[in-house]
């Protein structure tokens, strides 16, 4: 999840939910009726009903030098929403902001359309629901010198259904990837006013050697994230995300997450 590093606004990376610990309440479970987020672009995801945990090893590259900075843990599971709607619940835990960031997203399983999002960071907390083509929520930020948090109500018109930027890599893996595939997809980024269209394109199909999983055949997909263009390596056989890289152009650095959890099957 996706996974824009914390140096870029709120580190659009994260999501996994520990059963009951960070449960999203009844309101966000009001998923809208299934319909594709982008007409003509159908996503498909096979998700096990029980929790599934995937660990990525994160490295940072500056000036051609790599350094390991920790891990990103993604936990996903299927839950039932109102009316029996199947929803995908994802939580991500990773270091950032002088502590640990926990991002949780809830999406319609059939379309991956955003339903709700929560981000718990050392300096602030964000909670959003996506209903009726808008994002409604609260951002709570810590004041100077560890003073009390300040709550700000948020309403952002989105112009229709949208994907959560915290699940960029999952959305990419669920696309009908093939040679020359290209589409423009809308993602939610609160700091950029809500709806952010991003070009997504298959660059190539190739065999790539990964540090833990060895050589695999993958789709190499690019995503035009503003200020942090992403490249995502998706296993052609399992559709698992094997690697995600964000290039932070303004800081001449990149973040790379390599999967270390063995592939299923």
Where are these regions (language model features)?
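Compositionally biased, intrinsically disordered/low-complexity regions enriched for serine, proline
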Residues: 2, 23-25, 36, 92, ...
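Acidic, serine/threonine-rich low-complexity disordered tracts
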Residues: 32-134, 181-265
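Sec/Tat signal peptide C-region and signal peptidase I cleavage site
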Residues: 27-30
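N-terminal secretory signal peptides that target proteins for export/translocation
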Residues: 1-9
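Surface-exposed beta-loop interaction hotspot
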Residues: 133-181
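Context-gated lysine
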Residues: 15, 24, 124, 150, ...
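Bacterial N-terminal signal peptides
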Residues: 9-25
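A ubiquitous, low-specificity "background" feature that marks scattered single residues
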Residues: 15, 163, 170-172, 241, ...
């Amino acid at each position: 999840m996706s996974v824009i590093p914390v140096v870029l606004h709120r580190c659009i990376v994260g999501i996994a939910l520990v059963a009951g610990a960070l449960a999203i309440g009844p309101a966000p479970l009001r998923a809208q009726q299934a319909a594709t987020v982008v007409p003509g672009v159908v996503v498909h995801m096979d998700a096990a009903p029980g929790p599934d945990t995937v660990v990525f090893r994160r490295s940072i590259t500056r000036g051609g030098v790599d350094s390991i900075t920790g891990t990103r843990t993604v936990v996903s599971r299927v839950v039932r929403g109102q009316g029996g709607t199947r929803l995908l619940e994802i939580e991500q835990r990773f270091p950032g902001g002088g502590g640990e960031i926990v991002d949780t997203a809830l999406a319609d399983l059939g379309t991956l359309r955003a339903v709700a999002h929560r981000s718990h960071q050392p300096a602030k907390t964000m909670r959003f629901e996506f209903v009726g083509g808008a994002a409604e929520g609260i951002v709570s930020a810590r004041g100077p010198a560890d003073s009390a948090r300040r709550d700000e109500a948020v309403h952002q018109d989105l112009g229709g259904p949208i994907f959560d930027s915290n699940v960029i890599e999952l959305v990419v893996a669920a696309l009908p990837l093939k040679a020359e595939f290209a589409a423009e997809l809308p993602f939610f980024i609160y700091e950029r006013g809500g709806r952010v269209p991003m070009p997504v394109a298959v660059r190539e199909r190739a065999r790539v050697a990964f540090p833990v999983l060895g050589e695999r055949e993958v789709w190499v997909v690019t995503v035009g994230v503003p200020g942090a263009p992403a490249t995502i390596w998706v296993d052609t056989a399992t559709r698992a995300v094997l690697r995600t890289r964000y290039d932070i152009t303004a800081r001449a650095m990149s973040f790379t997450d390599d999967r270390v959890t063995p592939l299923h099957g």
